[in-house]
């Protein structure tokens, strides 16, 4: 089991498997949050403490909600506002043991300008 949590432990996440790749994005939100995200099919990540211990931030084109703990403010994940078949979760790997992130290939995504990966 790959288990992680926000700093205070109110929001707990369990991943269905270790990611092979994660993304570091430089869009106006991600660069401020500083997270590295791995993506999973919506509904496959076990999230405890959500929604009772979380708050959300919705901005831009209003298709995603960024979720953070109400108590410690750690961003745990994002999820689609209207999940369609094939929808994804973006899970912040900073909430897991550092060894998980160290084992994952991190790709750099230019969400600020080109909307393309910039590490190819």
Language-model features: locations:
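A short Gly-Trp-Pro
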Residues: 1-5, 10-120
């Amino acid at each position: 089991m790959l288990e992680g949590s926000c700093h205070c432990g109110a929001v707990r996440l369990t991943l269905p498997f270790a990611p092979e790749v994660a993304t570091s994005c430089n869009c106006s939100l991600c660069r401020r949050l500083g997270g590295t995200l791995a993506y999973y099919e919506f509904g496959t990540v076990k999230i405890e403490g959500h929604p009772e211990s979380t708050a959300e931030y919705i901005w831009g084109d209003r298709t995603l909600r960024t979720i953070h703990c109400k108590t410690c403010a750690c961003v745990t994940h994002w999820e689609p506002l209207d999940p369609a078949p094939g929808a994804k979760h973006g899970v912040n790997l900073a909430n897991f043991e550092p060894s998980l992130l160290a084992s994952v290939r991190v790709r750099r995504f230019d969400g600020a300008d080109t909307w393309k990966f910039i590490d190819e």
